[in-house]
Amino acid sequence: MEPHKKFLFLVVVGGRSPKANIELHDVRWVIGSKIEDTFDQLRNDWFGSYNELHIDSYKKIESIDGYKINLRNKENNEPKNKIFKKRKFPNKKLWFVNIGGYDPSSMQEKHEFGFVVASSPSEAKNKANSKWLIDSQKKHTDDIYTVKSFTDVDECEVIKNINDWEIELIPNGNHLEEKNIPDWFGYMRIDKK
């Protein structure tokens, strides 16, 4: 691994909020060379109490749907990848999709989420629906964001600026489906520096 190479991480964080009766969770996408580099950003983005703030799982995202994820720091004027400049790609974007659904034997709404590469919100929803919560009833899309850069989203709430990183999608030719399985899961406290 290159010493300062940055990666996109998808992180599930958990914690408490003063008026909540149960532990709450959120999903964040952050950038760092290693997961520990993202802790400050995760703490800053958390909406509840810092006490007992923790990571439940994370995954380093390197490729999605046959595209390599390349990160470019716009602030440092890093040049775009040569392959990206030479070829015209369809208007593909990286989307985060959160699918909800129900199981009649459970009180809670089930969720499955992750990234897909698609040209439009409807294509992103269709891809996610074809992969996730296959056996759930009343399946629906709870959240969908396009993640072009970490300062832009598609007609939804604003994603906080994360060091002005831009995402380049580079076809990697392997078309292997990257499994939506965490690299790590458990209980990792991040409430204290």
Place the predicted regions along the sequence by residue.
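A cross-kingdom feature marking solvent-exposed beta-strand/loop segments within repeated
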Residues: 17-30, 36-53, 106-114, 134-137
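Primarily single-stranded nucleic-acid-binding OB-fold modules
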Residues: 139-141
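Surface-exposed interaction/gating patches
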Residues: 80-137
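Intrinsic disorder/low-complexity detector
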Residues: 1-12, 20-21, 44, 50-101, ...
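Structured beta-strand/turn binding interfaces of compact recognition modules in eukaryotic regulators
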Residues: 14-16, 33, 100, 119
